[in-house]
Structure formats: structure tokens, C-alpha cells
């Protein structure tokens, strides 16, 4: 049985930063992804926001709090916005090729929702470059990286991490891995609403007893090509691209990302016109080629039809400023368990996210989790292997049962269940007590069906069918948690809108948590340092 100080789940910016920081701190570090290595995810889609040309980060901090409808933890917002310029500098010194202004500094533009120009990027190569920089740092510090490793069970003793059970699809076996600390830093659950990926790490901790926070909040990405899962960076709008209806009438994009997504969602045949980007066009060359390969649309000559989809789920594993997963209250920690990036809910975004803040959140939470995990594991010993050995045997039996030939005349496959999930979500066009309860009833039925999903492949080697079964089951559980959290929030705030409670209420100025049994709880909103509001709720 392998034993590592720190195991990191994921392969995006947060996971790479966490793994590199942990290894740099002296911890033996293993990084695992359920898919092939090298997939950057969506965190870097809209660049990185930092107050490079401002005397202080106060405006960035206040824009973030306002966009989050005052549901952000203000001490976290202060810490992350204060470190934003440092994050830009680190990426630049490690090789990221920003677009530059006449002074040679990273070029910043004013993205929607920001009061000042502060969002920088590298055009369509931003995500690839961020991924490359992260991989180079991980290799530099000796992180061991493995792909096609599917996490099955988080093994713990009284909410203290012992290790985890993993399906190794490279060697075709179920194995146990001992660890002192586990950092969950893979994807969120936005893939449940379309054709994207659902992270397994969040569900892993959820099944182990961790209550998820703020699951009702998610944002729609406005520039999604209709009928596909291709999301275009909103940075195109800063370079001269415009959104209008098919008739040519330009849309009023409003002042926030939510306004833009709603305007596009309500428009008649909305399209993106990126034919006149001028000198900025070369920065988007690889994106234009990708769109042409996927859709046949030449963005240099044609407009692109749009249809907003859920692109970012804000809720996730509740963490403190060190990246530790908290349970019930800020004072209780699921010992040895950390989270970062898309799988976590740091309190930075609140009820909606600003462009450029998503990558900032991933980098900051990844660094915090990796640094603290390395320091903490240095003084810890490994737990007993007894529970882990039993969990491996149980997982082997469960997987073997799933792979057995099913002689039943009627079987349920992932595609059918996923289509039913999407249909249930699409039919819920607005949120109210009745519509959310109806959706929850449908989801409970799907959750029951998901327990007996049919697996066509019988081998453990590269069994993508089995991986999709796990993802489908996780997606349904995550959406159920989101609906239960939405039922508990009897108000409209940020990206979450209810028909029967159209106004925000001070009574719900707190975080809502929900566990696997459906028990709803609360987590207090954190003010700034010293217990004072940095920006009082309005």
C-alpha cells in the first residue's frame, strides 16, 4: 500500500498550485486526475483580475463584494484582492506571456462588473499557458502526477483522513492510498447542466459526511456557442466584439455579468460579432481555429449564435483561509481534508463571480491549501491501515458487482439518465417552492435509478463507461444538494432568483449548508479583520 504525506485530486490551476506548494514545503506529494493529464479546465477562461494600475485594491475588493450581493466573506475578499498583483507577478516570472501596454506592463482592461481596468490575459492561450506554468512548477518540486485515477472512497476515522480508495484505470486495479492530508481541487458540478465534466472530489467528501455550502449559486456563461459546450472568453468583448440580435439590434449588456447573461438569454437569436477585432485579432487565432473545427463557423467572417449555459458553480466544500474543510462551524475542521478551486467554496465570490476572479480564487486557495498541508503533515503520523484495507475490499466487491453481466431485459444506461436529468432541469424555468419541490421529486427518482446503471465495458482498464457512471451519479447528488439549498434560501440574491421571494432579505445574510441526508444548516458570514464590515450590506 502506498503512503504519501499529501494527495491532491485534480489537474487544473488550483490542483497544480496546491501540489507544487505542498512539495515545496517538504511533503511527499501525489497528484491524481480522473482523466488524462493536461486538461486546464475553465478557471482561466476570463483572465486574471488585479489592481495593477491602482494605488490600492480597495475598488477591486468592493466590486467583488457588490457583485457577490454582500454574501462574500469579507476577510477572504480582502486577503485575495491584496494578493492579486502578486499572483500576476508570479505567473509572469514563471513564463506566462501577457499582452502588454506601452509601458511594458501586463495590459489591463475594464471587464464588465469592474469599476476600473484590472483584467489581464494572454488572449485565447491564457488557459494553456496557466496550465503549462503550473505543470512546470509541479515538476520542478518533484510532484508525482498520475492520470486516469478515479477516486472511489474517502476513508476516515471520526472525520480524520486516513486515506482514499482509487480505481487505477491504467493498471486495471482498485488500490488503497494512505495519506496524512487530502486536497480536493478538481472540477465543480457545472457539467451536470450540459456536456461538461462533473468533478468527483466534491462528491467524494459529500458522501464522507461533509456538508456543502452555497450550492444554490451558479452563474451562466453568456458567450456559449448554441448547441455546443464551447465557451468563448468574455475578453472578446473588451477587444471590440459585440453581441446583438439577428436583426442587428445591439443588446444592452448592463453593468454586471449577470445582466449580460440575462440579456443574451432573453434576446431573440443573439449572436456574437467578432469580425472587427483589429490589432487584437492575432491574440484570438487559436480560438478562431477551434471554433471552425468544432462548428464550421469562421469567426473572422461570420457571427456566432449564442445560448448561455451554466458555466460556473459557486457552491462547494466550505473552507477557511487555510483551505481546510470546515464542518458545522468555522471552529471545526474535517482533520486532514482540504479543498481548493472549483471544488471549494471559499466565500470569495458570494452570490456571483466577477470576470478574472475565478482564476484568482483558484490560485489563492490552491496556494493556501498546499502551504498549510505541508506544514501540518510535517508533525503528523499515518493512521492505521485497518480501515483502509477494509474499504479497499468493499470497493472491489462493489465495482465487481457493477461489472457483472446483467441478464435483465431492460437496463438503464448513462445516456438515458443524463438526458432525463437535462430534461428535468430544462423544464424548471423558474424557481419557487412548488417548482423546486417538483424538481427534487424528479431528482430523487433519478438518484434511485442511478444506483443500478448498466456498465457495458467489463474491464477495469481505461473503462470510460464506468467513469461516466460515477460522474452521472455524482451529478445527480450535487444537483439535489443545490435544490435543497435553494429551497432553504427564501429570498433572491445575486445569481439565485426565486419567483415567490423576489427580494433580498437580511434574515438570509448567511451561508446555507446541506449534507448527504438533506439536513440543512447555516454557516455565519465572516466580516473583515477585527469583526467590522469592509463594505456594509446595502
Task: List where the protein language model places each region.
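An anion/pyrophosphate-binding glycine-rich loop and adjacent beta-alpha core
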Residues: 204, 210-310, 372, 376-378
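N-terminal Rossmann-like FAD-binding beta1-loop-alpha1 element of flavoenzymes
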Residues: 6-30
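Glycine-rich loop(s) and the adjacent beta-strand/alpha-helix scaffold that form part
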Residues: 181-230, 347, 355-372
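Core beta-strand elements of the Rossmann-like FAD/NAD(P) dinucleotide-binding domain
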Residues: 2-4, 171-181, 333-336
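Conserved redox-cofactor binding core of oxidoreductases
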Residues: 87-173, 178, 221-228, 233-234, ...
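Glycine- and aromatic-enriched mobile tails/lids
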Residues: 1-3, 21, 25, 38, ...
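Conserved N-terminal glycine-rich FAD pyrophosphate-binding loop of Rossmann-like flavoproteins
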Residues: 33-65, 69, 223, 233
Amino acid at each position: 500500500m502506498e503512503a504519501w504525506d499529501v494527495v491532491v485530486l485534480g489537474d487544473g490551476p488550483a490542483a497544480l498550485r496546491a501540489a507544487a506548494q505542498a512539495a515545496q514545503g517538504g511533503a511527499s506529494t501525489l497528484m491524481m486526475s480522473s482523466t488524462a493529464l493536461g486538461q486546464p479546465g475553465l478557471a482561466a477562461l476570463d483572465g486574471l483580475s488585479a489592481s495593477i494600475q491602482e494605488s490600492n485594491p480597495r475598488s477591486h475588493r468592493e466590486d467583488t463584494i457588490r457583485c457577490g450581493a454582500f454574501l462574500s466573506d469579507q476577510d477572504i475578499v480582502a486577503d485575495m484582492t491584496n494578493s492579486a498583483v502578486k499572483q500576476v507577478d508570479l505567473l509572469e516570472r514563471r513564463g506566462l506571456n501577457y499582452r502588454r501596454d506601452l509601458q511594458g506592463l501586463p495590459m489591463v482592461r475594464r471587464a464588465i462588473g469592474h469599476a476600473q481596468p484590472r483584467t489581464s490575459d494572454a488572449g485565447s492561450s491564457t488557459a494553456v499557458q496557466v496550465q503549462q506554468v503550473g505543470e512546470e512548477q509541479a515538476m520542478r518540486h518533484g510532484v508525482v502526477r498520475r492520470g486516469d485515477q478515479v477516486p472511489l472512497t474517502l476513508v476516515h476515522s471520526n472525520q480524520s483522513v486516513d486515506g482514499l480508495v482509487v480505481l487505477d484505470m491504467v493498471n486495471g486495479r482498485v488500490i488503497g492510498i494512505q495519506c496524512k492530508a487530502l486536497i480536493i481541487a478538481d472540477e465543480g458540478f457545472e457539467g451536470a447542466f450540459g456536456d461538461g465534466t462533473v468533478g468527483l472530489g466534491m462528491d467524494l467528501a459529500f458522501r464522507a459526511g461533509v456538508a456543502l455550502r452555497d450550492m444554490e449559486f451558479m452563474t451562466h456563461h453568456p458567450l456559449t456557442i448554441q448547441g455546443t459546450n464551447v465557451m468563448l472568453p468574455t475578453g472578446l468583448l473588451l477587444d471590440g466584439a459585440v453581441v446583438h440580435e439577428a436583426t442587428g439590434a445591439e443588446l444592452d449588456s448592463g453593468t454586471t455579468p449577470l445582466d449580460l447573461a440575462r440579456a443574451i438569454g432573453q434576446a431573440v437569436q443573439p449572436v456574437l460579432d467578432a469580425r472587427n477585432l483589429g490589432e487584437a485579432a492575432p491574440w484570438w487565432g487559436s480560438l478562431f481555429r477551434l471554433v471552425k473545427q468544432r462548428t464550421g463557423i469562421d469567426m473572422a467572417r461570420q457571427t456566432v449564435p449564442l445560448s448561455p449555459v451554466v458555466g460556473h458553480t459557486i457552491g462547494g466544500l466550505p473552507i477557511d483561509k487555510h483551505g481546510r474543510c470546515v464542518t458545522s462551524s468555522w471552529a471545526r475542521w474535517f482533520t486532514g481534508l482540504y479543498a481548493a478551486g472549483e471544488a471549494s467554496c471559499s466565500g470569495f465570490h458570494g452570490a456571483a463571480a466577477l470576470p478574472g476572479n475565478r482564476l484568482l480564487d483558484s490560485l489563492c486557495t490552491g496556494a493556501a491549501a498546499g502551504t498549510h498541508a505541508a506544514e501540518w503533515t510535517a508533525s503528523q503520523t499515518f493512521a492505521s491501515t485497518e480501515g483502509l484495507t477494509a474499504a479497499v475490499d468493499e470497493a472491489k466487491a462493489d465495482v465487481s458487482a457493477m461489472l457483472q453481466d446483467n441478464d435483465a431485459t431492460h437496463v438503464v444506461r448513462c445516456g438515458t439518465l443524463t438526458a432525463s436529468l437535462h430534461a428535468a432541469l430544462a423544464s424548471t424555468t423558474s424557481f419557487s417552492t412548488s417548482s423546486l419541490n417538483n424538481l427534487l421529486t424528479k431528482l430523487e427518482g433519478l438518484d434511485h435509478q442511478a444506483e443500478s446503471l448498466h456498465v457495458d465495458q467489463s474491464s477495469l482498464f481505461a473503462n470510460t463507461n464506468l467513469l461516466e457512471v460515477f460522474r452521472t451519479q455524482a451529478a445527480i447528488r450535487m444537483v439535489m444538494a443545490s435544490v435543497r439549498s435553494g429551497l432553504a434560501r427564501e429570498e433572491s440574491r445575486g445569481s439565485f432568483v426565486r419567483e415567490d421571494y423576489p427580494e433580498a432579505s437580511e434574515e438570509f445574510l448567511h451561508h446555507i449548508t446541506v449534507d448527504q441526508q438533506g439536513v440543512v444548516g447555516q454557516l455565519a458570514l465572516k466580516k473583515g479583520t477585527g469583526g467590522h464590515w469592509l463594505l456594509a450590506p446595502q
